[in-house]
Amino acid sequence: MATIKEIKAILETIVDLKDKRWQEYQTDSRAGVQKAILQRKKNIQSDLDEEARLEQMLVYEKKLYIEHINLIAGIDEVGRGPLAGPVVAAAVILPPNCKIKHLNDSKKIPKKKHQEIYQNILDQALAVGIGIQDSQCIDDINIYEATKHAMIDAVSHLSVAPEHLLIDAMVLDLSIPQTKIIKGDANSLSIAAASIVAKVTRDKIMSDYDSTYPGYAFSKNAGYGTKEHLEGLQKYGITPIHRKSFEPIKSML
């Protein structure tokens, strides 16, 4: 009779819930075997659910693949709402039908997984571009226009020319064909990839600023108006990276 350890190893090779080998092991009365069967089936179902989710997030890309358009850049930004720091945009071109496990809107992914998924994107992407507009630009032309500038810069920094742009809720002044997608980071893998790249990039920038301007907890709040950040403003005043066109900073000038 096979040991529980040996059976567990065999179960790991089964990837189909309809595999006939399940019947052989389900008659084994040992609790350890039954527990292993339940866990393996749970893992397989989880993988199937993830595959279906990723497939659904390729709907916009697949419409373009049918038209023989394969170099598709997903574009997203992070940092429109904070009181301090830049707005950061990313443009990412993934290979056709590329499915990176657990890739999703950055807001739906636990922060502890951001770096791993970010690295997977960098490893698999055909091209990645970053665009950054600082607080001075935001104050000069407003956050909406600064966001568009950052997105255009991100596209210009791609090492591969995109044939089509998938953009999260924006239309850019570019001649490249584009599709505006509401909640794009939750509905397109290309945009979700850009969301993660922009998020990790901006978080690193704000973490570095925490060393330059201590007392505002930038590494924790990324420039958003948390209690700790607002207390820092009252105690230490405005820094060069604060957005002077945003309240409450505007009223502090």
From Swiss-Prot:
Keywords per UniProt: Cytoplasm, Endonuclease, Hydrolase, Manganese, Metal-binding, Nuclease
Residue ranges occupied by any RNase H type-2 domain in the UniProt entry: 70-253
Cofactor note: Manganese or magnesium. Binds 1 divalent metal ion per monomer in the absence of substrate. May bind a second metal ion after substrate binding.
Places the protein is found: Cytoplasm
Binding site for a divalent metal cation: 76-77, 168
A GO term for molecular function: RNA binding
UniProt KW Oxidoreductase keyword: no
One Pfam family here: RNase_HII
EC annotation from Swiss-Prot or TrEMBL: 3.1.26.4
Catalytic reaction list: Endonucleolytic cleavage to 5'-phosphomonoester
Annotated GO biological process: DNA replication, removal of RNA primer; mismatch repair
Biological role: Endonuclease that specifically degrades the RNA of RNA-DNA hybrids.
Family affiliation: Belongs to the RNase HII family.
Name listed for the protein in its UniProt record: Ribonuclease HII
